[in-house]
Amino acid sequence: MICQTYDVVIVGGGAVGSSIAYHLAAEPAFDGTVLVVERDPTYQKCSTALSWAGIRQQFSTPECIGMSGYGFEFYRNAPTWLAVGDDALDLGYVENGYLLLADEINRGQAKANFDLQSE
């Protein structure tokens, strides 16, 4: 049965919208209803699919570093976590590294950010 009202309406079903919906559904304390509104029902032309799949890894605040780390853990485990029965999900996720360039003026800050990220 289709609901006429929802507790949460998420506009956009790309990575962020889908993540919010997934985490709400996975949260035992949440018993509400969720609607994801995405103009592309195939998800082939949503913002995430068109982003070239670049995933930023270098951040300079503990909060962003923590969110990035969780994101990478999720991508690594998505085939298992999002499997339906014996059908694992293939995101096509491949870790290729990330290149960050800095000139001499910004080299110190880039190094400090790298050190913070590596803690």
PLM regions and their residue ranges:
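Short, flexible hinge/linker loops that cap or flank conserved catalytic cores
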Residues: I2-C3, P28, Y93
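Beta1/beta-strand and adjacent pyrophosphate-binding region of the FAD-binding site
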Residues: I2-V16, L35
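Flexible, glycine-rich phosphate/dinucleotide-binding loops
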Residues: G17, Y43, G108
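Glycine-rich FAD pyrophosphate-binding loop
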Residues: A25-T48
